[in-house]
Structures are given as C-alpha cells and as structure tokens.
From Swiss-Prot:
GO CC terms in record: cytoplasm
Enzyme class, broadest EC rank: transferase
NCBIfam families referenced in this protein's UniProt entry, alphabetically: PRK00668.1
Catalyzed reactions per annotation: a 2'-deoxyribonucleoside 5'-diphosphate + ATP = a 2'-deoxyribonucleoside 5'-triphosphate + ADP; a ribonucleoside 5'-diphosphate + ATP = a ribonucleoside 5'-triphosphate + ADP
UniProt superkingdom: Bacteria
Protein name per the record: Nucleoside diphosphate kinase
EC number of this enzyme: 2.7.4.6
Source organism of this protein record: Helicobacter hepaticus (strain ATCC 51449 / 3B1)
CDD domains according to UniProt: NDPk_I
Length: 137
C-alpha cells in the first residue's frame, strides 16, 4: 500500500468544503491514516515549499499558504500518489477535468484547493515533514 500527503489549502478550508473533499478520497478507496488541522507559520511554509524557493511564485505561494488554516492528511491505498493526483485534477482549475476536486472547488491556479505529493519519494518526505510515525495509523 502506498501513502501520500494531501493538504486542503486555506481557500477550500474557508469555503467549508473539507468534508466534501475528504469524501472524494474515501469514496475512491483512499484511507485517511493521519489528519490534522493547523495554521502554517511562514517558516513552515517556506521550508515545505523550499523546492520552489527560486521560482517567481514562491512568495505568493507562501503568503497564500499562511493566509488561513490547512488540513494535512496522510492517504493510503493502491497507487495512492497517482490516484490522489487524478482526483485533484490539473493545477490550473480551468484546465481540470469536470468532477475533479480542483474543477469543483478551486478558484484559481494559486487558490487551487489542494496539494498532493507528486511522487512516492516526495510523499515520504512530505509526510515526515508534518507527521511522526506514531501519528500514522
């Protein structure tokens, strides 16, 4: 069984669609092994998105991610990384297929409702960033 990280971003939390997004995961055989709601600090967001530090959108991304609470989850299932990415849809909600999380709940390429790990290796690192092993069950 694979594990992947999912973050429900501040825009979706503010809209009150946490439950609807979780339902998408559970309805598609992705089990929630760990979950917490938290407010990222600037330091947290900068460290988590450090891979994008030199990109022009980095400051806006960090500002957005600290603009409100997020819900961080570990999802588990067969092909969890790709299944989660398929459920999320394209990064730009205007390009996301109908019925995907971003098509249904995202506002823009910046406020795009969810984050999901893009590889198994990144999933392991991202999960470890937010959760200790004893928190995952």
């Amino acid at each position: 069984m694979e594990q992947t990280l999912s973050i429900i971003k501040p825009d979706a939390v503010k809209k009150g669609v946490i439950g609807k997004i979780i339902d998408r995961f559970e309805s598609n055989n992705l089990r929630i092994c760990a979950m917490k709601k938290l407010q990222l600090t600037r330091c947290d967001a900068e460290a988590f998105y450090a891979i994008h530090k030199e990109r022009p959108f980095f400051k806006d991304l960090v500002d957005f991610m600290i603009s409100g609470p997020v819900v961080v989850m570990v999802l588990e299932g067969n092909n969890a990384v790709m299944k989660n990415r398929d459920l999320m849809g394209a990064t730009n909600p205007k390009e996301a297929e109908a019925g995907t999380i971003r098509a249904d709940f995202a506002q823009s390429i910046d406020a795009n409702a969810v984050h999901g790990s893009d590889s198994l290796e990144n999933a392991k690192n991202e999960i470890a960033f937010f959760f200790s092993t004893r928190e995952i069950c």
